[in-house]
Amino acid sequence: MHVAKTFSAYIARQFSAWFGGVFAAMVIITFLLDYIELIRRGGAKIQATLGLLLEMAALKLPHTAQEVLPFAILFGTMLAFWRLTRNNELVVARAAGVSVWQFLTPAVLVAFLIGLVAVTIFNPIASLTEAVYEKLESHILRQGSDQLALSDSGLWLRQSDQAGNQIVIHAGKIASQQLVLDAVTLFFFNASTQFTSRIDAQTARLESGDWVIENGIRWVADEAPRPFDEIRLATTLTPRKIEESFASPDTMSFWDLPGFIELLEQSGFPAQRHRLHFNVLLARPFLLCAMVLVAATFSLRMQRRGGATLMIVGGVASGFLLYFVSDIVFALGLSTKIPVALAAWTPTGVSLIFGTSMLLHLEDG
């Protein structure tokens, strides 16, 4: 029993060390690539100084780290077991009667623990930094002028024109299919952010690049209220733009997502993107376990077939396949062709089935 515990602890340490090294290398590489891309995008922007772009790359780093985590587990596991196989440590262990499942268990447990920490502790931090990054990106690189927020009090939307005049729109209720706003209030501000007028109306709807505001009253400073039947205000917004302007799922903490999903659905907006992201986070610990099994199927075949080429090609192909399959099923989930939960869990399920079946073939076949 003591020997088994010592061996399991040794496997866990080897796995953790190789994973840590691979993870750090991948994060550094992606950080440098992101920084170079930000420099390219900000080259013509006066506000985009190298220091600010470096800060933006650092803010994006936690989100990037989450994205590369499954691939770091995959390649870290392959390298760990490749070293153990090359040093004949696994050969001796198997000769002593240790099954593949026994020496994989410590690595699987560590991967599951990493997944839990990543989702429950690291994700809230990454979502905060990603939210700051997206605000800076919108302001500095995209110079966005439209802002939208959804809360218990309704929909709040701000739009501005080229002259700097701003309109803040509040709606108590929304019909998202035609984007009809009910119980609408519009506040008008000039370029100096001074309040100029206000409109209270029953409804407002988007139609051919205009807000069509019906059955309302316009209040202008030092003037009597003026009722109206219809007013048109030019806008660059579209229903799709408004839906996409909601807080990105990447900026929402794992703990905040369920409440925001409920708020979206109560307001009449689709919540597929956020529901998919929530399920992907739920599946993350199990996906990391699956990556350990998939990596083991290639690294353990070395001792039987004697080549590192198969391990490298198999690992790269597995990573590419995971990325490709995930993109396809996520797109199907977002388009409601398949249930969102099924789309989110499919990459994990396929990886688990593949890894388990291949290991069964190696061990018992």
Task: Put a short name on every predicted segment.
Residues 4-15, 86-104, 300, 304-310:
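Interfacial "coupling" helices/loops that link adjacent transmembrane helices in transporter permeases
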Residues 270-361:
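Transmembrane alpha-helical segments that form the functional core of multipass membrane systems
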